[in-house]
């Protein structure tokens, strides 16, 4: 039976992951069978087991399944356990091993590709779902001075902060208090609100200072609304999630195939191959 790989999400037709892993496979001379599988939340667990029965040995997991994927894993990396979220699955025998590579992917993109020094920065994280949980630990480890999390459901923000285990550096605040939080050198949108094409981000301009970098973990059309606000607010840098996607994919590829591929080729190919993506940097 041929080893199979996939990305699970809902929706997932827009995903660039199959193209990315096909390119990585060609670079490394490895035949890769990787496809996108759309599963509604209530169908995820059964769909994942059907995938395993059909030769599935590795998978990426995107919204809204990252926390559900965490729950099915028998073993977890330390960073996945801390995040309470999984985006990379590896089949070991008849069980799943889980990791989260989003955080290290984001840090690699911001530091290596965009030349940012994250040390000493005050950061605002918007959202507290699986995507937010997957990047928060790595950003703290990269030297963020203070992490402030806001979410429309404050209990979710509190849960994320508790999971970080760093009460002196990571705090939650109410959405209604955004105007009173001061300014930040890094603002990260980890919500999926931008997938609603009619959405308009209306965040206080007081969040921005002369050094602010605004990052949307989404890419393509889903990142347009937040990054439009960031440009209007005159953020110094605006970054979408394409680079993070490529870097986290390379980390997943390493776990599945034992080699970490070079990422610049596929990043530039994706960036130049789409009119929407071409304007994001």
Swiss-Prot record:
A Pfam family this chain is assigned to: Shikimate_DH
Catalytic activity: shikimate + NADP(+) = 3-dehydroshikimate + NADPH + H(+)
GO cellular component: cytosol
Binding residue positions for NADP(+): 127-131, 151-156, 217, 241
Gene3D superfamilies membership: Leucine Dehydrogenase, chain A, domain 1, NAD(P)-binding Rossmann-like Domain
EC annotation from Swiss-Prot or TrEMBL: 1.1.1.25
Molecular function GO labels: NADP binding; shikimate 3-dehydrogenase (NADP+) activity
Keywords for the protein's UniProt record, in alphabetical order: Amino-acid biosynthesis, Aromatic amino acid biosynthesis, NADP, Oxidoreductase
Pathway: Metabolic intermediate biosynthesis; chorismate biosynthesis; chorismate from D-erythrose 4-phosphate and phosphoenolpyruvate: step 4/7
One Gene Ontology term from the biological process aspect of the record: shikimate metabolic process
Catalytic residues (UniProt): 66
Recorded superkingdom: Bacteria
Binding positions for shikimate per the UniProt entry: 15-17, 62, 87, 102, 219
Record's function text: Involved in the biosynthesis of the chorismate, which leads to the biosynthesis of aromatic amino acids. Catalyzes the reversible NADPH linked reduction of 3-dehydroshikimate (DHSA) to yield shikimate (SA).
Subunit: Homodimer.
Stated family: Belongs to the shikimate dehydrogenase family.
Name the UniProt record assigns to this protein: Shikimate dehydrogenase (NADP(+))
Organism: Stenotrophomonas maltophilia (strain K279a)
């Amino acid at each position: 039976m041929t080893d199979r790989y996939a990305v699970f999400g809902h929706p997932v037709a827009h995903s660039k992951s199959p193209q990315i892993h096909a390119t990585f496979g060609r670079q490394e001379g490895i035949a890769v069978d990787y496809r996108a599988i759309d599963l509604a939340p209530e169908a995820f667990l059964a769909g994942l087991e059907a995938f395993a029965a059909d030769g599935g040995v590795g998978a990426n997991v995107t919204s809204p399944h990252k926390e559900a994927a965490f729950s099915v894993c028998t073993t977890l990396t330390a960073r996945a356990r801390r995040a309470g979220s999984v985006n990379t699955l590896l089949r070991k025998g008849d069980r799943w091993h889980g990791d989260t590579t989003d955080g290290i992917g984001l840090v690699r993109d911001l530091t290596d590709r965009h030349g940012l020094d994250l040390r000493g920065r005050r950061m605002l994280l918007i959202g507290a779902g699986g995507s937010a949980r997957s990047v928060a630990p790595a950003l703290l480890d990269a030297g963020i001075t203070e992490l402030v999390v806001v979410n429309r459901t404050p209990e979710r923000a509190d849960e994320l902060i508790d999971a970080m285990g760093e009460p002196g550096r990571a705090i939650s605040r109410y959405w209604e208090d955004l105007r009173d939080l001061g300014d930040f050198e890094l603002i990260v949108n980890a919500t999926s609100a931008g997938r609603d094409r009619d959405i308009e981000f209306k965040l206080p301009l007081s969040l921005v200072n002369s050094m602010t970098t605004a990052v949307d973990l989404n890419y393509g059309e889903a990142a347009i609304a937040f990054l439009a606000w960031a440009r209007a607010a005159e953020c110094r840098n605006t970054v979408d999630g394409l680079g993070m996607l490529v870097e986290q994919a390379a980390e997943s590829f390493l776990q599945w195939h034992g080699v970490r591929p070079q990422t610049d080729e596929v990043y530039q190919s994706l960036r130049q191959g789409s009119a929407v993506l071409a304007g994001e940097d």
